């Protein structure tokens, strides 16, 4: 019985796990010439998979394969010769007809005589146990041509038994899995495992990033230990995470078929493959089977200065709200990435002051060593005469998609040196914090420059003596989000003066859930409940928000709810609005809040019926099963009806990944004297102040001040024009993905996705004693352009797919307060402007000689504007504030 079981297992394993035959790989018969046909084709489209919507090309040929030598000591050690003949290049889509770029052109005209000759020269492949030992070709052949031959040769590497292993072929060192059957072998290559040197980068934030998926399956039909047919298919799909309409697909196929065999060259005798190769042709040299990098040369392309002359008109200040400005900004960045320092410096020095800020945006966004050296040489940080340019450079550094240690080192050097403007010095440190976080997210926390920057931030905060320095380092820490900085933030949050305490608390607000430990919550509870000292309302409410948003305990929630009713009137209303917003929006804390509210002591009419005008509301801008865009607006007033803080946030979520798109906070304090009102508890001695702070795409910017001090306030009230103050304005490279792919056919593919925007965020605070009314305005104007460019290049023919998606949008928040009576009237409005939405598509096939086929499409629509809903109480209040005035029918004195 045991013997039968053993025999059965042996039979099953040999039948299912290997192809019939005695070798571990392909084996050629002696003195035979195998004549095959070969073709490789590539298709590009937007993922629809329809041939008529695709662009691409096919390279085909006859192939002769012969065994030159077999090791007398082992059958599985072979040297084979592979020769391509009768090469042809044609369209995959035969519907091109007269539009075909290949029509009437011979292969030598398409490829060039030298390239064609090189492609048809034989290559040698040394196989041991079916795996490539060495690949031999001639020196000084074009890399692109050698890659095509590598792609064909790699098909002959296989094994005839099931299993998983690592192989080196044209794709690199890859993990492959073989599934062997009686007369068939399926080879699955894990393309994401392939180790091959290729340039590329991507945006680390998942929301703004690009997702890709690649597959490779090769099917071998085997007869007598040799292939009678091979079919390989490789696909690359990619898509922009937050906008799924932006996607693309590359399909590469190879097909090899045996047509016949005939008498071939006699087997050469010898014990070493090297001696045989030398005897065949001494000009053969061993080269890597792994695909090599090549660059297609641009013939007659304009210089950087010529390109800039045609681009600069689109980047004039008056044109920045147009999509063509962003489109040209993105295109120019691509040219800057191949430019030398001297070329870049030349155009910087020649430009005028109106266009220079936009040029600085582009040069900094290029993120190359040459562009960084050029901009650092150009900007003089010791002078305060070019503050706008210095600030634009620093913010472009903060928004950098793939910053490196070199950039961080440059900022540290500038900070340690002489800086003419205190505002610029502060901005350098704030952006240093941003770069630390981005490099740490990309596993660069142990880089020397990052370690130095951490010490600079934490050490500077510890030793800071001036209030301005403390604020600077806290803002840097708010961007860096260093776990080791939390104790310092807690210290300043609990013991610091009002503005410093508030800044430290809002910095803690940006940390992820795992960092808001029980110890952190203990300190925040002490701040909220004022166990050790009296705190301003802004600090207390920020502390409560952190507790409620980070897995609060039952007692945390209960104590906060019990405090409602005992707080100053407007803070009471604000905290009540926060709790109601948690319940209405089904935030994570909503379940535990509902549990606590079941207790009568926490949930009673007296506690939840207090009047006031402060509010908090969260809503959806857009929602789908995989993503969501949310907005939140909360406003806290003083007891006298004057704004203390308004906070407008926009978030984008994809799955569990999030992006803090924007935050605009307007703060005011110490304005009660203007209307002879009594300040709230703990705020009796505050200086008059109003200012604005912004976070943009996860980067905290340097706050701006409307006025500081009573005399400054009065002078600005008397001379006020109502014009908004800009917080940030410029061109930003937001999405930046570049990927170079080595297709197993030997062709080279590139995927480029770029997203840029022209942005202008401004704010204003208007105050009228005559009408006893104040208005707060925040305007967001954004023009967004996202471009994709997919190409497959063989050096003599290129196919490409370019798309562009663009829109121009506006979002305005207005808060109107009438404090001529109490309770005062408050109306909040949040409006989104009507926005055009345009999509462009361009597909092309182009020969290196210049002849091309182009197909273009355009689609336009309009996204309707809307007013975002806030709570019902606000709607009722707005009807009163903006009640229609009765028509006057009197025409005389009486």
From Swiss-Prot:
- Phylogenetic lineage: Eukaryota, Metazoa, Chordata, Craniata, Vertebrata
Q: Which UniProt keywords apply?
A: Disease variant, Disulfide bond, Endoplasmic reticulum, Golgi apparatus, Lipid transport, Lipid-binding, Signal, Transport
> In which broad location class does this protein mainly occur, judging by the first location in its UniProt entry?
endoplasmic reticulum
Name of the protein: Microsomal triglyceride transfer protein large subunit
Recorded hits in InterPro entries, A to Z, give: Lipid_transp_b-sht_shell (IPR015819), Lipovitellin_superhlx_dom (IPR011030), MTP_lip-bd (IPR045811), MTTP (IPR039988), Vitellinogen_b-sht_N (IPR015816), Vitellogenin_N (IPR001747)
* Disulphide-bonded residues: 174-194
Q: Which organism is it from?
A: Homo sapiens
What does the UniProt record report as the effect of altering residue 189 to R in this chain? No loss on localization to the endoplasmic reticulum, does not reduce interaction with APOB or P4HB/PDI, partially inhibits triglyceride transfer activity, does not inhibit phospholipid transfer activity and apolipoprotein B secretion
Where expressed (tissue)? Liver and small intestine. Also found in ovary, testis and kidney.
